[in-house]
Amino acid sequence: MNSHFASAHTPFYINTKEGRYLVLKAVKVCDVRTVECEGSKASCVLKVDKPSSPACERRPSSPSRCERMNNPRKQVPFMRTDMLQNMFAANRDNVASRLLN
């Protein structure tokens, strides 16, 4: 990456007249001059398109306790992690048997 650029990985909020925006990734640019402009006179103002969906609604807060903590006997199902290994082994065995026959 160029030495003039630094990436900010921490999400943050920007409060604007239109609402609050969550910035997931930002790029900091160094050694770039700032052009002052007034929104009523200039065309260099950031354009923000209004969302077509209804305004954001606050969701109720999540429950304070995890469901797993309430029922310790209930086991969490795990996905088979050896699935790819078994697929490759079966493919290898099929190819080997074809070559030997």
Curated annotation (Swiss-Prot):
Recorded GO MF terms: DNA binding; molecular sequestering activity
Record's superkingdom?
Viruses
Record-listed Phosphoserine modification sites: S53, S62
Record keywords, A-Z: DNA-binding, Host-virus interaction, Inhibition of host innate immune response by virus, Late protein, Phosphoprotein, Viral immunoevasion, Virion
Q: Which InterPro entries match?
A: Phosphoprotein_F17 (IPR006854)
Q: Using the record, list the residue span of the signal peptide; answer none if the entry has no such feature.
A: none
Phosphoprotein in keyword set: yes
Q: Where is the composition biased (Basic and acidic residues)?
A: 56-70
The subcellular localization recorded is: Virion
Which GO CC annotations does the UniProt entry carry?
Answer: host cell cytoplasm; virion component
Pfam families, alphabetically?
Pox_F17
Q: What is the effect of changing S53A?
A: Complete loss of phosphorylation and about 90% loss of binding with host RICTOR and RPTOR
Single Gene Ontology BP term? symbiont-mediated suppression of host innate immune response
The UniProt function text for this chain reads: Plays an essential role in virion assembly and morphogenesis. Also plays a role in the inhibition of host immune response by dysregulating mTOR. Sequesters host RICTOR and RPTOR, thereby disrupting mTORC1 and mTORC2 crosstalk. In turn, blocks the host antiviral response in part through mTOR-dependent degradation of cGAS, the primary poxvirus sensor.
Q: What is this protein called?
A: Phosphoprotein OPG062
